[in-house]
Amino acid sequence: MSKYDVIVLGSGPGGYVTAIRASQLGLKTAVIEKESLGGVCLNWGCIPTKALLKSAQVFEYLKHAGDYGLKVSEYDKDFDAVVNRSRNVAEGMSKGVQFLMKKNKIDVISGYGKLKAGKKVDVDGTEYSADYIIIATGARSRELPSLAQDGKKVIGYRKAMTLEKQPKKLIIVGSGAIGVEFAYFYNAMGTEVTVVEYMPRIVPVEDEDVSKQLERSFKKSGITIMTSTEVTAVDTSGKGVKATVKTKKGEETLEADIVLSAVGIKTNIENIGLEDVGIVTDRDKILVNDFYQTNIPGYYAIGDVTPGPALAHVASAEGILCVEKIAGHHIEALDYGNIPGCTYCSPEIASVGLTEAQAKEQGINIKVGKFPFSASGKASAGGNTEGFVKVIFDAKYGEWLGCHMVGAGVTDMIAEAVLGRKLETTGHEVLKTVHPHPTMSEAVMEAVADAYDEVIHI
């Protein structure tokens, strides 16, 4: 039986980053993976979807070339080539993880791993043992009883990335990050898209102003938005799909070629031996302490399978802290109140901290500032004037409570707010920090200036 210091079950952004950090700390490490290295994120999530979205963005620029003083007489899309480019990008990233495994002398064990008592893992009949076993098995597309996926007419996000034929009409159920990213992609490529959302507004976890802006932008692009709407049944017996939806006005039937279910994720914790070992779960999540230890000594869990936010960067951060604790380092628990969230539709969304509504619900006296990209020189020059930056501060102490952005490239801007909050930067300190001109990031400074009644450009 092969013996390791650390065995990581799963090789997504949680698993492979955990393994690399463990190896850096001098721990003999193995990773068990049943599919491709990199997990859902690199192969079926974060990375390939961004490749699809980039193709859509380039296609959009070609459509609007005249707005930039350019004449493009002929242009067209090749849907197969767009999909193939996305898959090639994903495969390249997975090979990159393979390289990192070799570089860091990490053993990669291919197969289905199942936990056993005594700090062991069975992989297709072969047993491996370790002093510490870290569960990082991630999650998959969640299915609703009224929206069972058949992989043909009712699909999940994986199939949506590799369709053989572009649908003329698409219904997307759910308007979280997955839903709105695919809504933008398919709409930009020429598909007639309808987004159905059960909650009163799209991207419901975001600040309400952000939701309103995205809905305006989507409607302007020709995307149909149906909020406070529930899909009660789907009929796939005909050529396409008929979806029965319940609205405030009653029931109606929507028709499309395909329905994409984007109603969240379900953790991959079944049939991995949790019950055999005695690891405690609650509502499909493995319960852990601040350092990701389960109730059974020697067994840890990170990423989507735990109660924290199901985000790749969270899984990576948790994994690093987990193995640093195992190695005896003195570490601080992760601050889950300062986790950025990014959505890569167009316009993009990025946020961190409290929304305005949440701050008010907590009874905090706040200062709120907002700066529209329509007043930004860089945004105007680039033709990307939709959206804004919104900041929220504690009125008494100047604490940066929240930052919410919607617009072109904002996912690359949010780190300023995350770092500022980490360092307990006050509003006045941000305001007095010189931002380069002309940049999109100036909007952060201007939004802060607006909160303190010192804004210059609006």
Model-found features: residue ranges?
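FAD-site-proximal beta/loop scaffold in flavoenzymes
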Residues: 151-166, 253-328
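Glycine-rich flavin
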Residues: 2-4, 20-27, 32-166, 194, ...
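Flexible, glycine-rich terminal cap/loop adjacent to redox cofactors
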Residues: 7-35, 47, 51-58, 327-328, ...
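Hydrophobic/small residue at the entry helix of a nucleotide-binding pocket
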Residues: 14, 38, 178
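Hydrophobic "anchor" residues
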Residues: 48, 121, 267, 294, ...
